[in-house]
Regions:
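Helix-coil-helix junctions within alpha-helical repeat/solenoid scaffolds
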Residues: 7-17, 31, 125, 133-137, ...
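Internal alpha-solenoid helical repeat scaffolds
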Residues: 1-160
């Protein structure tokens, strides 16, 4: 899934289905395995929110504990710093998207042991930012960041700071923007996780493009070949946005 190996993924999914249906499992084992399979399908339904919610509801009827498919520490967005970039697909559907995120969050947190807690604040904050409600967006960025810090979710911390960076830029405070760059970089470096370093590189490159500072963008982004960096599939759309901005600025 993360590396877009679709044929191999289909094969594995069919093998799991066959095992569940044909193995001599107890009722409890069958329910638990089927519930975990629903959480796997939740991941595979990315980024169709309606299907994801349905798989969560199916899993909740079968599992009496948090899922083992999605652990507390795994990043829900797999490196993407924006909930909105990943889930907004239908024109005029933003308010409905925010509503569904808030309505489904308790079920998701229960099934995943509070994985990526605060993503609903992040989405709402992005919506408010694009509607030029910058003060409200900034408040929501702080809410998302504080929740992420509480639950030790590095990816969400970076995402919340990225939202705040954009809001601060729109407010016309470049000194604060570059201060937030340093904070994003420090969090990513301290994590020791290559995924978060890639996320930080892209967030900072996105902002540098606004300031025409392409010389400060990491070379792997400028080269335009994300395959060499083994970027997860959910992060590629954001990479494309950043690379597109760089290409425009080169003209």
């Amino acid at each position: 899934f993360l590396m877009d190996e679709k044929e191999l993924l289909d094969q594995v999914v069919h093998e799991i289905e066959d095992y569940i249906e044909n193995s001599n499992l107890s009722f409890k084992e069958h329910d638990e395995l089927t519930g975990e399979f629903e959480m796997l399908k939740f991941c595979l339904a990315y980024n169709d929110l309606n299907k994801m919610i349905q798989h969560c509801q199916n899993a909740a009827r079968l599992l009496k504990r948090p899922s083992m498919i999605i652990s507390t520490g795994e990043p829900m967005m797999f490196g993407s710093p924006s909930v909105m970039f990943m889930f907004y697909k239908e024109r005029g559907g933003l308010d409905d998207l925010v509503r569904k995120m808030y309505e489904s969050r308790d079920l998701y947190y229960k099934l995943t042991g509070n994985n990526s807690r605060g993503f609903e604040y992040l989405l709402e904050g992005e919506v408010e930012m694009y509607r030029e409600h910058n003060d409200k967006a900034e408040i929501l960025s702080y809410k998302a960041y504080n929740v992420a810090r509480k639950y030790n979710h590095t990816g969400m911390e970076i995402s919340a700071l990225f939202l705040r960076t954009r809001v601060v830029m729109y407010k016309g405070n470049p000194d604060k923007v570059f201060e937030l760059f340093k904070q994003i970089r420090m969090i990513a470096d301290n994590s020791g996780h290559e995924l978060y370093k890639q996320t930080a590189d892209l967030c900072i490159a996105f902002m540098y493009s606004y300031y025409n500072q392409l010389r400060l963008v990491e070379q792997w982004i400028i080269d335009g070949n994300p395959a060499d960096m083994h970027i997860y599939t959910p992060l590629k759309p954001f990479y494309a946005i950043v690379y597109g901005r760089i290409c425009i600025d080169r003209e």
